[in-house]
Amino acid sequence: MLTPRAEIILRSIVRQYITKAVPVSSSSILEDCGLDICSATIRNEVVRLETEGYILRPHHSAGSIPADKGYRYYVESLKDVELPTNDKFLIRHLFHQVEKEMEEWLNLTVAVLSQRVQSMAVVTMPRQTQGKVHHIELVSLQDNLVLVVLILRGAKVKQQLINFENTVSQPELTLISNRLNDAYAGLTRFQIEQKTLNLNPDELKVKDSLIKMMRGEDEQESREPFFDGLHYMLEQPEFHQNQRVQEIMQLLEQKKLSKMIAPPSPFNRGVQVYIGQENASAEIRDYSLIVSQYGIPDEAVGTIGVIGPTRMAYERALSAVSYLSLVMSTLVAELYGKPPGGKDE
C-alpha cells in the first residue's frame, strides 16, 4: 500500500508521462505535485516506487516512466470520472443529427471516441448474446459411438459425434440427456462452464461437446468491428518504430480485433480496463484496452472500446467509453422497442 505522499508522486509521474511522452525527472515531479519536500526526498520516493514495481527507470540517472502496475494504480483512482456536461450535450446532439440506422450510429461512435481519446476506437455491431440451450438429445449409433444433438434457442441445431469409454444403451443415454436438460436448459455456454455439477465421465464428455459446439456458434456470430482513429494512434511516439506499426496493421489485416475486444463474461455495463500484460491476447500485451458492452442483455449486445499504447489518456478514455456505451444502449433499446437500461444524463 502506498503512502499518501507516494500516491501523489506516482500520479504526477503518470500524468506527466501521458502528456509529454518523456521520462519524468525529480525536478518536474517537485514542480508539479506541490509538496513541501526537497529533491532528495523525491528521489528516495522514486527509488521506492521503482523497487515496488510501479515505475521504471531506463537508467538510474534518467527520469521515471510508469510500469503497468503504476498505470493500474492510477486507473483505479479514476473509476468515477464522467464527461463534462457540455461534452455530453454535444454527443447527444451529434447522434440526433444522423439517420436512425445502426451503421450510422456505429460510425459516429468510433469517430467521436477516437477524436476524444486520440487513439483507435472500435465498436462491434450488436448481436444476439451467447446462445442458450433449448434441448439436448443423445442418440446411440453403434457400440460406444454417440451423436450429441444440441438445439439452441431460436431453433438452431448443432450436432457432434463423441465416443464413450464403454458401450451405452439408448435408455442410459436418455437418462443422461434428461439430467443434462434439467441442469442446462436455458443456460449460456459461460453459465454451463461455471455451473458446479457432479458428473460422471460420460456426462463430462457430453458437457465438453456442448461447450465446444456453443463456442463455435458464438464465435461464428462475431462480425468484424467498425474502427476509426488509426492515424491518431500511429502519430504517437510509440509508433515511430516500424515494428509497432506492422504489429497493429497485422491485427487489422488478420481480422482479430473482434475476439480481442470481446469481454470474456456475461453482459456487464461497467467499463473494463486491460493494461499491457493484463490483456488475454499476446498480440496486444504492449497496449491498453478499454472496453464496455452496450445494448440489451440476452437480446442484442455489442462492445465499444479504445486500444492504444499503455501511455493512454485514461481519464478521457474511461469517461468517453462509459458515456458512449450508455448512449448506444439507449438507442438500441429504442430500436428494439425496449426500455433503456440506464439513464442518459
UniProtKB/Swiss-Prot annotation:
Q: List the disulfide bonds.
A: none
User: Is Chloroplast found in the keyword set?
Assistant: no
Q: Which GO terms describe its molecular function?
A: DNA binding
Please give a single GO biological process term from the UniProt record. negative regulation of DNA-templated transcription
Which UniProt keyword terms apply here? Answer: Repressor, Stress response, Transcription, Transcription regulation
Which SUPFAM superfamilies does the record associate with it?
A: GAF domain-like (SSF55781), Winged helix' DNA-binding domain (SSF46785)
- Family according to the record: Belongs to the HrcA family.
Q: What does this protein do?
A: Negative regulator of class I heat shock genes (grpE-dnaK-dnaJ and groELS operons). Prevents heat-shock induction of these operons.
Q: What is this protein called?
A: Heat-inducible transcription repressor HrcA
